Amino acid sequence: DKIHLFDVKLPNGEIFKESETYSPGYQAIIATIEQKNKIKIGMTICYDIRFPHLYQDLAQHGAEIITVPSAFSNTTGPVHWHTLLQARAIETGCFIVAPAQTGHHQCGRNSFGHSLIISPWGEVLADAGKDVCFINTIIDLGEVKKARLAIPSLKSHKRYLTNF
């Protein structure tokens, strides 16, 4: 489910109003793939990337890989795309797999592209750039455990009071 709909007015005048066409989802999803070992994959969509608690919840419930299929614009993509994905990888200690639309669309919109695969340490392992192509890399799930042991932010998180 895409939980957060993209209803924004960007500084360049672009307006996106997904709520006019779509309804939001209400459930965070983790799929389990049965292989030699179980692999847990958290699923998010596009604008969800801007809500770190969703990613932390997925990781807290066992996600080792989180997918983020997206269509970032040429306005937000160059300054936000890599940064947000790397931050979510680092915060959660998960691999991030982010397929992204690229190029010009019939409706006149342009998408930034840059399908990415990012390690739990925040390293970009594969980047498609603006190309229409297939990217891949070897994912060693042992890296998830290593990253989470090195920086145990998921276990260190504390609830706190506010004075506002």
Residue ranges and their predicted role:
Residues 49-135:
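CN hydrolase (nitrilase-like) catalytic-core segments centered on the catalytic cysteine
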Residues 34-36, 120-122, 140-142:
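Short loop segments at secondary-structure junctions
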